[in-house]
């Protein structure tokens, strides 16, 4: 069962878990766990995608309950009328607030995109980012005697493939758990010492004008146990009040300290 964050006669939003595909492609024909099919079975009606989240990313996924609703939502996304807010845990201390305007070349998959044009130049890509908190943990990673992490809020203003992951890597603050654009040594350390076994990127909120009622709509997605455990260990509880789960209790020895 997926957590339904919002539902009316036109729209449905769910909290997509990390590791789930939004829908099957010909590359993933045998995939057992797919968001669209699960939601369809859960609510008893077809759903229509309007945007995507990468497989390892969790958070708000908004769909239409008719092809018209899906089309109108997709149009809003394409015209940048929907505000997206993400949170990430990154390598190092990213403390400033700024806008990164750094074009990105199209990232093609060797198999899925084998017929796509390869001569496209870099496309505009803009991300607003804001450092929320930092921590230094007494765990050696590589040649450093301690490990530094940062909690970052991200608002993409464009929608390039892997934009947030690539922009943070460009800033030299890759997202923890990013196997493609990240720091593999940091990824291993985060998984081993702090249970960060996934890409630490969460789609926390979508804000939009409802395409049928015209009312403002803000949808928030709660954080999973991996995220909540990280916030507890790093002393960051209370920083994401709209997304933290009140019922979560950190395992013994994991509230801002390392268990022996």
UniProtKB/Swiss-Prot annotation:
It catalyses: uridine(65) in tRNA = pseudouridine(65) in tRNA. SUPFAM superfamilies: Pseudouridine synthase. GO terms for molecular function: RNA binding; tRNA pseudouridine(65) synthase activity. InterPro entries: PsdUridine_synth_cat_dom_sf, PsdUridine_synth_RluA-like_CS, PsdUridine_synth_RsuA/RluA, RluA_PseudoU_synthase. The active site is at residue 54. Its EC number is 5.4.99.26. It comes from the Bacteria. GO terms for biological process: enzyme-directed rRNA pseudouridine synthesis; tRNA processing. NCBIfam families: PRK11112.1. PANTHER family: MITOCHONDRIAL RNA PSEUDOURIDINE SYNTHASE, TRNA PSEUDOURIDINE SYNTHASE C. Responsible for synthesis of pseudouridine from uracil-65 in transfer RNAs. Belongs to the pseudouridine synthase RluA family. This is tRNA pseudouridine synthase C. It comes from Escherichia coli O6:H1 (strain CFT073 / ATCC 700928 / UPEC). The gene is truC.
